[in-house]
């Protein structure tokens, strides 16, 4: 998606060789008009899949998922990283390692919201090593729901996550795929 690639070129900030900060428009301050265009693109890619739920993980995927859900006319579920008092009853759980934070989390979704008849589209802001996506896929499969695919804002194609998830037979559509990035040369797209 050229619009997202252009925004990354203009406003993304490199920190080291593998960290791209896009917090001015994607995952801290959010450009809702950009999200609307991203949501339209996800709909174009997955419109014939019968999506009934969008699943993401807290926190950075929530904004993109909510805007996209308007176009699919479906609810959003976000996996929580900690069990809280307001999640009662049975839950699906999975472990994920955060690339950004270097921590392992148990992610949780209440069983009442993720049903076997659901057709689920996973949406997230980044795909790097694939751990978050693997954890979300586990939740969908544990629920007996149908996974229609994953919509990713930014994929670091030079890291193993995309190949790993596609190798599991999951359809992955990334709006911006980064071939390489460095402080010296900036970001190069696939």
Where are these regions (language model features)?
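Conserved acidic residues
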Residues: 52, 118, 148
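Active-site-facing substrate-recognition patch
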Residues: 1-51
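PRPP-dependent phosphoribosyltransferase catalytic core
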Residues: 6, 18, 137-190
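Short Gly/Thr/Asp-enriched flexible loops that form oxyanion-binding sites at enzyme active sites
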Residues: 63-72
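Short, glycine/charge-rich flexible loops or terminal/linker lids adjacent to PRPP-binding catalytic cores
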Residues: 74-120, 187-189
């Amino acid at each position: 998606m050229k619009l997202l690639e252009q925004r990354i070129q203009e406003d993304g900030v490199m920190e080291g060789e593998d960290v791209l900060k896009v917090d001015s428009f994607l995952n801290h301050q959010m450009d809702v008009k950009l999200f609307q265009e991203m949501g339209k693109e996800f709909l174009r890619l997955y419109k014939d899949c019968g999506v009934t739920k969008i699943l993401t993980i807290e926190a950075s995927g929530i904004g993109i998922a909510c805007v996209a859900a308007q176009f699919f006319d479906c609810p959003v579920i976000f996996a929580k990283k900690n069990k809280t008092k307001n999640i009662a009853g049975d839950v699906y759980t999975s472990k994920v390692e955060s690339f950004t934070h270097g921590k392992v989390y148990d992610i949780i979704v209440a069983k009442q919201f993720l049903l076997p008849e659901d057709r689920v589209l996973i949406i997230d802001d980044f795909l790097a090593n694939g751990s978050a996506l693997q954890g979300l896929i586990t939740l969908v499969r544990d629920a007996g729901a149908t996974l229609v695919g994953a919509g990713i804002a930014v994929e670091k194609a030079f890291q193993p996550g995309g190949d790993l998830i596609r190798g599991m037979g999951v359809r992955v559509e990334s709006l911006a795929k980064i071939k390489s990035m460095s402080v010296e040369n900036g970001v190069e797209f696939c």
